[in-house]
Regions:
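P-loop/Walker-type NTP enzyme "switch/lid" segment
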Residues: 1-31
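P-loop/Walker A phosphate-binding loop and immediately adjacent motor/lid segment at beta-alpha junctions
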Residues: 12-19, 71-92
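Conserved beta-strand segments of the P-loop GTPase G domain that flank and frequently precede/overlap
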Residues: 3, 36, 55-60, 83-87
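Beta-strand-loop-alpha "switch" segments that mediate conformational coupling across diverse proteins
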Residues: 87-135, 147-149
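Inter-motif core of Ras-like GTPase G domains
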Residues: 40-63
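Histidine-centered active-site loop/cap adjacent to the catalytic His
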Residues: 134-159
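Short, conserved loop/helix-junction motifs that constitute active-site signature segments
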Residues: 50, 74-79, 104-105
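Glycine-rich phosphate-binding loop used to anchor ATP phosphates in small-molecule kinases
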Residues: 28-44
Length: 159
């Protein structure tokens, strides 16, 4: 479920957000409802977090991104968080991989399957999910396979 630019100025309360999401999920009759929120502790984010079965967030293996991830893991350690390393080069940066391990060590936060870097993602013109095409463009096939692995991981995690 995407957000809207007007949402920032007209945010419902945490409880109203949670109630609305639960109501909509029931009306839609779907197994999954994915809520895309923006970073930060807003009422909308906190409402979505309060009812989430799993909180999936991508983590590029870069120093500044890991700084933010470390802060987020401390703040959200009580939530069912799964971190997905994203834009991972063919040879993952060892220091950042070790740091990610240290960030989650001693917390219930899990690290899921990685998504490989693919230049084609950044230059792609189609406005549809990469996994919607069967098969996706050759350059995107490793990314599509990884996204399917993430989906399977999340399904198993929340079962």
């Amino acid at each position: 479920m995407p957000g809207h630019p007007d949402l920032e100025l007209n945010q419902p309360s945490r409880d109203d957000t949670a109630d609305a999401l639960l109501k909509w999920a029931g009306e839609w009759g779907r197994d999954w409802v994915v809520v895309d929120t923006h970073p930060g502790a807003t009422d909308v984010v906190n409402g979505a977090l309060s009812i989430a079965h799993v909180v999936v967030t991508q983590v590029p293996l870069r120093s500044s991104d890991l700084d933010g991830t470390e802060h987020m893991v401390r703040e959200l350690a009580d939530y069912p968080v799964v971190l997905i390393p994203n834009f991972v080069p063919p040879v993952a940066p060892a220091a950042e991989v070790r740091r990610l391990g240290r960030i989650v060590d001693g917390t219930p936060v899990q690290v899921g399957p990685l998504i490989p870097a693919a230049l084609a993602v950044g230059t792609r013109k189609k406005r549809m999910a990469i996994t919607s095409e069967d098969p996706p463009a050759k350059a995107l096939q490793p990314v599509a396979a990884a996204l399917r692995q993430v989906a399977a991981f999340v399904q198993e995690y929340s079962a």
